[in-house]
Amino acid sequence: ARPTLFNVVDCQDVRVEDVRLRNSAGWGLSFHQCCDMTLRGLDILNRAYWNNDGIDLTDCKRVLVEHCNVNSADDGICLKSYDPESGNDSITIRHCEIRSSASAIKFGSASWGGFRHIRISDIRVFDTFRSALAIESVDGAIVEDVVADGIVARNTGNPLFMRLGQRAGHRKGVLRNITIRNLTCDVPFGRPDEGYDLRGPETS
């Protein structure tokens, strides 16, 4: 398996601040089942391989991500859940700038547990191939009490993607109490990520 720059599992009171991270062989910062975390002032460039994410939060609770600059070949900041009895809860993402050859901020697609009490604000998105914000529940997750306020996207494929599905026959998930406010997006005629060395998959 390709190594990540940070792979933190089952930890609490985690603080990562003012760190410059460059071109992991895999995901950039990956946190699994952690709680009470602060990620602040990170400068992440992670484009060495086509599916390199910037920050991945998997089944984490009480997390603050702020004042980060993320430039990734895959999703910028991604919330995932592999544990049906857990999920991501009480996550705040604010004051960040993101470039991505996939989605800037994404829920899923791994979505067995839930995504609850998520706050996203003051996000600047540039040169992003897919979505400024993608919310997906395809493995049975309950996505609820989500507020995204103040996302400005330039040269981005689309502003918002939401998907509710039953991948591999799992129970259908739920999307409820989701608020999107003050979302502005400029969508280009051509590819928004044309300056990237590695791109997401082509569509036909």
Residue spans of the language-model regions?
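Extracellular/periplasmic carbohydrate-active domains that bind, remodel
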Residues: A1-S204
